[in-house]
Design a protein with these regions (language model features):
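Internal alpha/beta loop-helix hairpins
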Residues: 1-57, 79
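Non-catalytic connector elements of ABC transporters
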Residues: 39-41, 49-163
Length: 163
């Protein structure tokens, strides 16, 4: 069982207070996002109020609090990334935030599988995707094969890149 409210501290100071769900889904810093679970981080640059350029890809996300040209870190939880073999096209209205990737490794963890992806057009780091085992069986995932990933804009957190 977990507490009703969590106080997250760093260097002796409280940096966020909220319910477990609030802290997990709306962490107010990369430190908290990474501390309260696994997170994929992708570096990018703001190009307009709803878009960041990450590698070779434009990602739709909420960049309204950042200036054009500002370096940012996009963050998305492994369970929020959607896998598909279907190529999304501009005519079906879902082309935004769809990236081609290659499956690097699949780790079976019982009720879910963790899939490590090489999404080179987006980031040089491997991305992690957690998918229920039943869904993974339906997709017939195999290492060294291509897959399409979708990053739902509503699940992407944007942070200033402080590096």
């Amino acid at each position: 069982s977990m507490a009703d409210r969590i106080f997250v501290m760093k260097d002796g100071a409280v940096i966020q207070v909220g319910t477990p769900r609030e802290i997990y889904t709306t962490a107010n810093s990369p430190f908290i996002a990474d501390f309260i679970g696994i997170m994929n981080f992708v570096s990018g640059t703001v190009v307009d109020i709803h878009t960041a350029r990450c590698g070779d890809s434009n990602i739709t996300c909420d960049t309204q609090f950042y200036a054009n040209g500002q370096n940012v870190r996009l963050a998305i939880r492994p369970e929020s990334v959607v896998l598909s073999h279907a190529q999304k096209s501009a005519t079906d209205g879902t082309s935004s935030n769809n990236i081609e990737a290659t499956i690097d490794e699949i780790e079976f963890l019982g009720s879910f599988e963790r899939v490590y992806l090489d999404a080179g057009s987006l980031t040089n780091n491997l991305m992690m995707v957690d998918i229920p085992s039943t869904a993974a069986r339906g997709l017939e995932l195999n290492a060294n094969t291509g897959i399409n990933i979708h990053l739902p804009a509503s699940d992407i957190r944007v942070y200033a890149d402080e590096a």
